[in-house]
Amino acid sequence: MRLSDYYVPTLKETSADISVISHKYSIRAGLIKQIASGIYTWLPLGLKVLKNIENIVREEMNKSGSLEILMPLIQPASLWKESGRYDDYGSEMLRITDRNQREMLFGPTHEEVITDILRTTPVSHKDLPLILYQIQWKFRDELRPRYGIMRCREFLMKDAYSFDKDFSGAISSYNLMFKTYIKIFQKLGLTPIAVKADSGPIGGNLSHEFHVLANSGESTLYYDQDIIELMNSESIDVEKIKNTYTAADDMHDPQACPISSDKVKISKGIEIGHIFHLGDKYSKPMNANFCDSNNNKLLQMGCYGIGVSRLVAAIIEVFHDNKGIIWPETVAPFKFSLVNLYTSNDKCKKVAENLHMQLYDDVLYDDTDDSPGIKLARTDLLGMPWQVIIGKSTVEQDLIEVRNRLTKDKVLISTEQFLNKLKK
C-alpha cells in the first residue's frame, strides 16, 4: 500500500492535556479521531490493528469449542427489570424510548439477552456444555471518560457465556476460558496477571481479572513474582496459577498475605479481561432451564469479557519508545515500512517500486516527497515491526537497510537476499 494513496493523518504533537502514551500515540499516528467525549472513529490504520486483535481473539475462542453469534446492541429494558439489574448500572446505562413508548437501552453487557435466548429454545442436557460468544460494540456512559480508547464510552468487546448442567461443569468451563484468555494474551505479545476480583454488578461468587503491567494502569497489583513465569509458559497450569498469590489493591491484605513481603511485587496494571462464574444468578430469576430426564433444572452459567478495543491501548502502553509505537508482528497493521528517502533518484525509485510490488499486502510504502528526516520520524511513529530503508549510498552498493523496530538491530543486505529470506 502506497502512503500517498492511504489515509494516515499523523500529527507532530497532541494537546497538553493528553498525558497517557497510548492516547498520545494513537492520535499522533492517525489511528483514531475523537468525535465526542469518549467516542472515537477508527481510521484505516487503527482499524487494521483492531481487526487483527479481533481475529486472534476469534481464532482462540473457536479453538476452545465456543460458537460465535451476534446479539443486538439495543435491548428491551424489560429483560433487565426481570433479572433485577435494571438499576445496577445507574447513569452509566443509556436508556431510550422507541416510537411506541417502549423502554429500551444500549447494552453495556448481554447476560439478560443470552439468558433469554436459552430459555426460549429447548435445551437438553445433551446440548451442554455450551459456550456462545460475540464480538460486539458496547456503550457505557462513563462519568469521566479518559485516556483515549483505554476508558471510553463506546468500545469493542468480546463477551462469552457458558451454560452447564452443574457446578462442576461450570467450573470446567470457567477454567477453559481462563486458559483460553492466557493463550490470547500470549499471542498478542502480552504477559497478563490474573487476580481474584470482586464481581460487581455482573454478579456471581467467583471472578478473576486479567491485567497487563503498565505504568499508566489504574489498578495497583500485588503478586508473587513466580506468576510471570507461569503466565508466560506454553504449558498453562490453571490451578497452579490460581493458587499463586495475586491481588488488586481492593483485595490485598498485607496481614493475611501468604507469602513473605520480599517476594511480593507491586506494579500498576491495565485491566484487559474479566471472567465470572455466575451460577444461577440469571437463570433463576429468568427461569432458564434445561431438561434432564424429564426434569427441568436451572442452567449454571459463566460470563467472560475481553476489551478488544482497550487492547489496542494496552499494547501501545507496553510496546513503545520515545519515537513512537512498536507493534508486535501479530497485530501490526503492516509487517513492513518501506521508505524511499530519495524519490527523485531513479535507482532508489526502481528498487523501492520493485520491493513494493513484492511485499504489496504486507507493506506501507512511503513514496511521498517529504524530507528523509520527516519520513524516518514518521515510520518510527507508526511502528511497523520492520523498516526497509532505501538510500542513495546503499543503493549504489546494491544494498538496502533493514531495521528491526523493537531491537533496533540493522543489517545491510541485497534485495535478492532479503526477498529470499522472506520465502523461507
From Swiss-Prot:
Principal localization? cytoplasm
Gene3D superfamilies in alphabetical order? Anticodon-binding domain, Bira Bifunctional Protein, Domain 2
> Which CDD domains does the annotation name?
ProRS_core_prok (cd00779)
Location in the cell: Cytoplasm
Task: Give any Gene Ontology cellular component.
Answer: cytosol
EC main class here is ligase
For this protein, the record's PROSITE patterns field holds:
AA_TRNA_LIGASE_II
Under Gene Ontology molecular function, one entry of this record is: proline-tRNA ligase activity
EC number assigned by the record: 6.1.1.15
One BP annotation, GO = prolyl-tRNA aminoacylation
Which InterPro entries does the entry link to? aa-tRNA-synt_IIb, aa-tRNA-synth_II, aa-tRNA-synth_II/BPL/LPL, Anticodon-bd, Anticodon-bd_dom_sf, Pro-tRNA-ligase_IIa, Pro-tRNA-synth_IIa_bac-type, Pro-tRNA_synthetase
| Catalyzed reaction equations | tRNA(Pro) + L-proline + ATP = L-prolyl-tRNA(Pro) + AMP + diphosphate
Keywords of this entry: Aminoacyl-tRNA synthetase, ATP-binding, Cytoplasm, Ligase, Nucleotide-binding, Protein biosynthesis
Function statement: Catalyzes the attachment of proline to tRNA(Pro) in a two-step reaction: proline is first activated by ATP to form Pro-AMP and then transferred to the acceptor end of tRNA(Pro).
Q: How does it associate, per the subunit comment? A: Homodimer.
Q: Which family does it belong to?
A: Belongs to the class-II aminoacyl-tRNA synthetase family. ProS type 2 subfamily.
Q: What is this protein called?
A: Proline--tRNA ligase
Q: Which organism is it from?
A: Ehrlichia chaffeensis (strain ATCC CRL-10679 / Arkansas)
